[in-house]
């Protein structure tokens, strides 16, 4: 008896994790990627596995960010333009920025965060994934009283859901992170977290898929997904691939493919940036551990001998145009906390599109009206963090290995 065939559309962290766990369930899996494996939004993320960190819809942070939303030097920026779909999305997003919704989201994301940490540990140990994985946690460092207040709230919220987190004074942070300026007022430490090189992680997982007999095909642009009892995908080349099931793990590009199946996923592309710095041969990045800069939401992550500055959230459409001012803001933000970070050589400047939902939760499950087409998208800034648990959940949904849990039901596309 032949194995069931599953097509996974998208070769980022979500797609390869879905393929990996499907391959563990005796499935013939093929990953179809439009570009190269791991070269989309996964490539340039901050590399922080921030399990349990509160989602986008934190009311206090959102209210603060929306006051300067048209200022291109702030963490959240909306490019002025006529875009009815974005306006509708923002309306729904603001309606979800309540304490009640935040608590509901954490009730879903908390268990997923604990599960994904276990899966990461298993992957690193059992598959010997070489991705500069460091289970050293990360810091939130703040220079203002408002920032430290936000950090204390993050700690309280994460502790309430079983994650190890502690509030730190400025002096305590300075003792642990000696490269920071001495005007840091306080912050937090989240030990139930880790860091890695996200691109290497994706490439390594894709290699394990191939070792298990799966295929990864690059340069394969999927233009249409056909549903029904015998699903299939059509490529830009005119080719047609049939399968027993299809998984859409196409990030910010999921909207169009799902729409043709009658499903309107309210996903907006949130552009993020990174700038990688190297500090000369034999030198190490000027940080002992990863940290997020509380007032600017910029992550500073030591990664494979370099320092990655990553962050910002920009709504400017489905494009990869980079704005120099956004890149410059990354360095300017880091210098507020680290001082002069030169002499450093810029080795990479990048932007990518994160798929953002208005309620702050990913979209995982069967598309409405379909029995064999599944979505795995909408992770915003948590794609790397939730990659393994998403892959495991999707594999169970596709194969029917276990009944859907409460968390999976909350992520279903039908909620929209």
Question: Residues of each region from the PLM?
Answer:
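Helical element adjacent to the flavin cofactor pocket in flavoenzyme catalytic cores
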Residues: 149-161, 180-237, 241-244
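C-terminal lid/capping helical subdomain adjacent to the catalytic/cofactor pocket in oxidative enzymes
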Residues: 4, 167, 361-416
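Glycine-rich phosphate/pyrophosphate-binding beta-alpha loops
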Residues: 46, 193, 297, 315-318, ...
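Active-site substrate-recognition segment that forms the wall
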Residues: 47-49, 53, 57-96, 222-231, ...
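Dinucleotide-binding Rossmann-like beta1-alpha1 core, especially the glycine-rich loop
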Residues: 46-168
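Short beta-strand to alpha-helix junction loop
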Residues: 104-117, 140-150, 175-176, 188-207, ...
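Beta1/beta-strand and adjacent pyrophosphate-binding region of the FAD-binding site
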Residues: 2-12
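Glycine-rich FAD pyrophosphate-binding loop
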Residues: 24-43
């Amino acid at each position: 008896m032949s194995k069931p065939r599953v097509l996974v559309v998208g070769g980022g962290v979500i797609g390869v994790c879905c393929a990996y766990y499907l391959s563990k369930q005796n499935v013939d899996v093929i990953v179809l990627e439009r570009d190269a494996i791991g070269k989309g939004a996964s490539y340039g993320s901050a590399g922080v596995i921030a399990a349990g960190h509160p989602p986008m819809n934190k009311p206090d942070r959102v209210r603060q960010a929306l006051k300067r939303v048209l200022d291109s030097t702030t963490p959240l920026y909306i490019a002025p333009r006529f875009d009815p779909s974005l306006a509708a999305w923002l309306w729904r997003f603001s309606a979800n920025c309540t304490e009640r919704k935040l608590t509901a989201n954490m009730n879903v994301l908390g268990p997923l965060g604990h599960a994904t940490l276990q899966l990461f540990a298993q992957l690193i140990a059992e598959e010997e994934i070489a991705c500069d994985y460091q289970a050293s946690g990360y810091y939130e460092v703040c220079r203002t009283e408002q920032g430290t207040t936000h950090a204390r709230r993050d700690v309280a919220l994460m502790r309430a859901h079983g994650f190890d987190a502690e509030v730190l004074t400025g002096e305590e942070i300075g003792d642990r992170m000696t490269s920071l300026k001495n005007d840091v007022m306080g912050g937090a430490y989240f030990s139930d977290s880790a860091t890695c090189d996200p691109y290497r992680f994706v490439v390594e997982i894709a290699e394990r898929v191939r070792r298990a007999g799966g295929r990864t095909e690059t340069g394969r642009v999927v233009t249409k997904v056909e549903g029904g009892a015998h699903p299939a995908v059509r490529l830009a080349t005119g080719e047609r691939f049939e399968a027993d099931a299809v998984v859409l793990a196409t990030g910010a590009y999921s909207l169009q493919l799902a729409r043709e199946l009658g499903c309107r996923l309210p996903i907006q592309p949130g552009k993020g940036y990174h700038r990688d710095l190297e500090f000369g041969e034999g030198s190490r990045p000027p940080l002992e551990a990863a940290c997020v800069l509380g007032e600017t939401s910029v992550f500073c992550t030591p990664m494979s001998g370099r320092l990655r500055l990553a962050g910002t959230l920009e709504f400017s459409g489905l494009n990869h145009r980079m704005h120099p001012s956004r890149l410059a803001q990354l360095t300017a933000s880091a210098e507020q906390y680290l001082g002069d970070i030169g002499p450093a050589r810029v080795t990479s400047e990048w932007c990518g599109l994160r798929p953002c939902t208005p309620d702050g939760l990913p979209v995982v499950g069967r598309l409405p009206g379909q029995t064999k087409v599944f979505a795995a998208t909408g992770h915003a800034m948590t794609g790397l963090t939730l990659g393994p648990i998403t892959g495991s959940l999707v594999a169970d949904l596709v194969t029917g290995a276990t009944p859907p849990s409460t968390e999976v039901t909350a992520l279903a596309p039908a909620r929209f």
